[in-house]
């Protein structure tokens, strides 16, 4: 059980810690905590919370992680940062998982992935977002080559703990499509990406992307296995459980 992305800019981390600890206790220690710095300006505008520059939001996220871990620890916790001040907060209840539930951080840029490498247990490999009033995916960051670069950043920042990290990916280059003609679907996908972003990706780059899942049941089973072997990715968020159920059966026991 877990959250994919909780926008910490919309929630005070000390209050969030109590909510998350309660969920972990009630679930018998099954919670995973997905956190993020926020990216969707309209989400902020709708409730009157300023949408700050990305660097400020990442600093808020960094402080929030420190506060969550402090609140989950034993005894009162105090913290004085640029964005939050905590004074003698007990942080009850405490989570069932000690020292805390696994933290899931993801991103496509070096700053967020470096933070994730230092603080998280699960790291989501995401495409980079081009900032603006309506952020959009940088299509170039969907490729396998871009993923290799992201993993290098993570390895450098994680140091000795790299082997303890779980790497995750999910379909952000379009929906999962089960088909016996993957190249035709990949050409359509490449055409849409070119029309929307101006970026030219080849059919091979589309099919090779860790963020695109197109092919037959056997194709997709091979791809999941290849992502584990090639990149060390062992965690996947999928967008169509029914379509991929045969893939899971194909991979059972591997």
Q: Which residue ranges define each predicted feature?
A:
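Active-site-adjacent structural elements that line small-molecule/cofactor binding pockets in enzymes
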Residues: 1-254
């Amino acid at each position: 059980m877990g959250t994919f992305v909780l926008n910490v800019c919309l929630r005070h981390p000390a209050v969030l810690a109590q909510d998350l600890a309660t969920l972990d206790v009630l679930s018998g220690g099954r919670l995973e905590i997905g956190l993020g710095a926020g990216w969707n300006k309209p989400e902020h505008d709708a409730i009157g919370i300023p949408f700050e520059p990305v660097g400020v939001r990442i600093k808020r996220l960094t402080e929030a992680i420190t506060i969550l871990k402090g609140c989950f620890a034993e005894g009162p916790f105090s913290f004085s940062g640029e964005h939050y001040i905590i004074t003698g907060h007990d942080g009850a209840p405490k989570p069932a998982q000690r020292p805390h539930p696994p933290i899931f951080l993801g991103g496509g840029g070096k700053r967020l992935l470096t933070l994730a490498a230092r603080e998280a247990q699960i790291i989501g490999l995401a495409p980079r977002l081009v900032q603006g009033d309506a952020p959009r995916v940088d299509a170039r960051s969907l490729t396998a080559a871009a993923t290799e670069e992201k993993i290098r950043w993570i390895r450098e920042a994680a140091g000795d703990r790299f082997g303890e990290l779980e790497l995750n990916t999910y379909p952000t280059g379009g929906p999962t499509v089960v088909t016996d003609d993957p190249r035709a679907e990949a050409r359509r996908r490449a055409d849409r990406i070119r029309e929307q972003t101006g970026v030219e990706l080849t059919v091979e780059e589309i099919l090779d992307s860790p963020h695109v899942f197109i092919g037959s049941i056997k194709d997709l089973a091979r791809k999941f296995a290849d992502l584990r072997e090639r990149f060390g990715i062992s965690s996947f968020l999928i967008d169509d459980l029914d379509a991929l159920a045969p893939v899971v059966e194909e991979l059972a026991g591997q």
